[in-house]
Amino acid sequence: MDMLSLNQLQLNIEKRNLFDLCITFLPSAITYIKGANGSGKSSLLRMIAGIMQPSSGNIYYKNSHINNCIKPYCTYIGHNLGLKLEMTVFENLKFWSEIYNSTETVPAAIHYFKLDYLLDEKCYNLSSGIQKIVAIARLIVCQSDLWLLDEVESNLSKENKDLLNNLIVMKANSGGIILLSSHQENVIKSAQILQLK
């Protein structure tokens, strides 16, 4: 089964244990990660994405340790959006699609987020909210079944928040696993909550 398992996953900072997690996320799960600033929400997502090492414990996805998973096995969007600012919107989408071998998905991402009129714009010319939408369009382009989203709803208009939340629900309905950290209220009522101390 395509589940995500955290096995005694710990993060220790300055002799303080931020969390010690044993939890499994099943396909179609949407999970809000909640907690105060400094509780380890961003670090947890970075660990699952393979960007940061835990202090101890293991992470398994699709029954394989993430160190053994074929990369890229997830789509991670953090505070650093991963945009190539000197490239155009279209060039960024094409770049990601080539990494994930999914070039056929670019038109769907452009259409869903109404990016047609921005395709030739350099990303450094875009507002922070539009830059974020271009980054979020990667969710459609990359076609992975594991989404890790770190406060992606900030700086978005209500319309774009609705588009994002609808996309998350559609991904869950098709068997995806979505983890998102958020300081905002839980808009997706079917989601579960993982509370970090």
Curated annotation (Swiss-Prot):
Transmembrane segments: none annotated. It catalyses: heme b(in) + ATP + H2O = heme b(out) + ADP + phosphate + H(+). Its main location: membrane. Residues 1-196 form the ABC transporter domain. Keywords: ATP-binding, Cell inner membrane, Cell membrane, Cytochrome c-type biogenesis, Membrane, Nucleotide-binding, Translocase, Transport. InterPro entries: AAA+_ATPase, ABC_transporter-like_ATP-bd, ABC_transptr_haem_export_CcmA, P-loop_NTPase. ATP binds at G35, A36, N37, G38, S39, G40, K41, S42. It is a peripheral membrane protein. SUPFAM superfamilies: P-loop containing nucleoside triphosphate hydrolases. Its EC number is 7.6.2.5. It is found in: Cell inner membrane. GO terms for cellular component: plasma membrane. GO terms for biological process: cytochrome complex assembly. One of its GO terms (molecular function) is ATP binding. PROSITE patterns: ABC_TRANSPORTER_2, CCMA. It comes from the Bacteria. The complex is composed of two ATP-binding proteins (CcmA) and two transmembrane proteins (CcmB). Belongs to the ABC transporter superfamily. CcmA exporter (TC 3.A.1.107) family. Part of the ABC transporter complex CcmAB involved in the biogenesis of c-type cytochromes; once thought to export heme, this seems not to be the case, but its exact role is uncertain. Responsible for energy coupling to the transport system. This is Cytochrome c biogenesis ATP-binding export protein CcmA.
